[in-house]
């Protein structure tokens, strides 16, 4: 039985993940993933998933250097067919942080989990014992030319509280 909550583990499902090292610092990245039910999984990766060792306590939702509290604005759709399943990701650039300019290089890797055979495959080969968070071993995309995306998103909401005092006080009484 699959867990359909956002950021639930994808390790027991047929799933697809990819990581973007947008600064090409070989340490940090943005991880996105899904399964055949189009569950959204995203996280910020710090220090290849090891986190900041100088910080002694962990924040809820942050495991080592994997910040699951980060919820980017993006969408994924999946389709099942005779061939298996496929997914299409739509990730606005405003959801990511990156340098602006021409001819940039980003790190990237892809991971496919096949639950039936307990197989995990990577696009950029990783030694046994490492996972997709190892951005220092990721492949590279060269020649990226990006302009500054508008980083404005309005999400109106209302939060209200009403308190009514039903007690009766005799304010005219004098002692």
Model-assigned labels for residue ranges:
Residues 1-175:
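Structural preference for beta-rich elements and adjacent junctions enriched in aromatics
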